[in-house]
Structure formats: structure tokens, C-alpha cells
Regions:
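Charged, alpha-helix-forming regions
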Residues: 1-128, 133-260
Length: 260
């Protein structure tokens, strides 16, 4: 991997790299992530849009990732993001659930990706947050801020839920909101989240499995396209499909097809 923290970057280039770091931190943990921690720390340290306290916490977490057992990191990730929907990495699940409105929202987002010259892996959905951040890392500052502004309510809710579970992954949502000066948005969600019933209990997870079993019996392509990515991941895990790493690219590099 090339040196990602080279000097003389413009603020916009620095934020592009910061977004790629956040994308990678939110994706399924791999040995590649652990090996790249030194470079991630350098990039985080150089991001002046984040307060010093947030940079320090992110850097400490990165080092903790490097020092942890990979299987433990992966188990934590699955328990946090793939058991229940409250902390789903699928943006539109927080807005539309599994309705057809979500399907249209995904089609619209896919169109945005294609206009920018990106093609997604057929296994991935466009509202997967690490993938979305990879896309934002290729956009201008103005466009990046607009997109983050559009999802700030989702990020703030997700931040509050991750805080409630004492997860360091909350740092990523804090960092995204900090890029547009919106960290205070989280305050309104904290009391609401404290009153929520957990959706990762055995009973709640059984209900999800039953719902997904019905979805996997859908006969039409349209119905299959509306399956939650959580359901797809459950099926992939049963079939032994491996997660691919989200890539971190240097500014100016030709963007690849997006996907995991």
C-alpha cells in the first residue's frame, strides 16, 4: 500500500483521505485493516476539521484494532451490525425500513453512482454506509457536505445507538458529523435511544430470521431486489462468502468498481 499521508495535501484532498479511512473503519475487519493502522493514524492526525480530542480517540481506537485478535474484532462487528437493525449499516433501512420507497431510494442513489462513473458489485446495496463514504471521498467539498447534511439525522441516531452500546464505532459517526459541524445533533437522540427496546435479543433475532425466510422465497426479481442487505449477509454467511476489503485510494487515482 502506498504512503497515504504524504505532505502538501489541500484540505479537500485531506478530507477525501479521511473519508476513506472512516469507510474502512466501518467495514468488516480484516488483516489488511490491521496492517494499515499506521497509515490510518497519520491521516487521522492530519485532519484539522476534527477537534483534537476526537482525533486522539480515533487514533487510540485504530491502535486498539491493530493490537486485537482479528477473530474477536470480527465477532464484535457481527454482533453489533448484523444482529438487529437498530445499528444497521444500510442507510435507507433507518428511513424506509423494507418498504418499496427504500427500493426507489436505492435506485436513485445507484443513478448518482453511475453518473460519477462507479459501478457496484452485484452483491452489494448502494446504501451500505462504508460504500457510500467511498463514493463521497471522490466528491468535492461542497457535494460531500451536502450529502452528509442529507443523512445527518441518520448519522446522529446511529451515533446515539452506538454510544448506548459503548462501542468505539460511534467515533466514526461523530467524525462524519464533525465534518459539517453537526455533532450536537446527537443530543436530541440520546434520550429517545435510552428508551428503545433492544432488537438484538434472541426473540427479536428469531423474528428477523422468519421475515428474511419469507423474503428469500420471493418469486420476482423486483421483490428480491428489495431484500435487506442484512438478509443477504445472512445468506452469504451460510454459503461461506468472504467479505472483500473497501479500498483506500490516493487522490487522483482512477476509482474502481465499487463493492466489497
Amino acid at each position: 500500500m502506498s504512503n497515504l499521508a504524504e505532505p502538501l495535501l489541500t484540505p479537500e484532498q485531506q478530507t477525501m483521505r479521511s473519508l476513506r479511512v472512516l469507510s474502512r473503519l466501518l467495514d468488516y475487519p480484516t488483516a489488511e485493516l490491521q496492517q494499515a493502522v499506521g497509515e490510518l493514524v497519520e491521516i487521522v492526525a492530519a485532519e484539522n476539521r476534527w477537534p483534537a480530542s476526537l482525533r486522539q480517540r480515533l487514533m487510540s481506537w485504530c491502535q486498539q484494532i491493530a493490537d486485537s485478535e482479528l477473530l474477536s474484532l470480527q465477532a464484535e462487528y457481527v454482533a453489533l451490525f448484523e444482529q438487529g437493525r437498530a445499528t444497521s449499516m444500510l442507510l435507507f433501512e433507518h428511513v424506509h425500513g423494507e418498504s418499496r420507497e427504500r427500493g426507489q431510494a436505492m435506485v436513485d442513489l445507484m443513478d448518482e453512482y453511475r453518473k460519477a462513473g462507479f459501478e457496484l458489485d452485484a452483491r452489494e446495496l448502494p446504501d451500505y454506509l462504508p460504500l457510500f463514504l467511498e463514493y463521497l471521498s471522490t466528491r468535492s467539498d461542497v457535494e460531500m457536505a451536502r450529502w452528509i447534511g442529507n443523512i445527518r439525522h441518520i448519522l446522529a441516531l446511529l451515533a446515539a445507538r452506538l454510544e448506548e452500546r459503548d462501542s468505539d464505532y460511534a467515533l466514526v459517526t461523530h467524525a462524519l458529523l464533525a465534518l459539517i459541524g453537526a455533532e450536537a445533533d446527537i443530543n436530541a437522540h440520546r434520550p429517545v435511544v435510552k428508551a428503545e427496546k433492544p432488537d438484538n435479543t434472541p426473540e427479536a433475532l428469531d423474528a428477523v430470521w422468519e421475515e428474511e425466510a419469507v423474503r428469500f422465497s420471493a418469486a420476482s426479481d423486483e421483490d428480491c431486489a428489495l431484500q435487506s442487505a442484512e438478509g443477504r449477509r445472512l445468506a452469504e454467511r451460510k454459503q461461506g462468502v468472504q467479505h472483500d476489503a473497501v479500498r483506500i485510494l490516493s487522490p487522483g487515482a482512477q476509482p474502481p468498481a465499487m463493492g466489497r
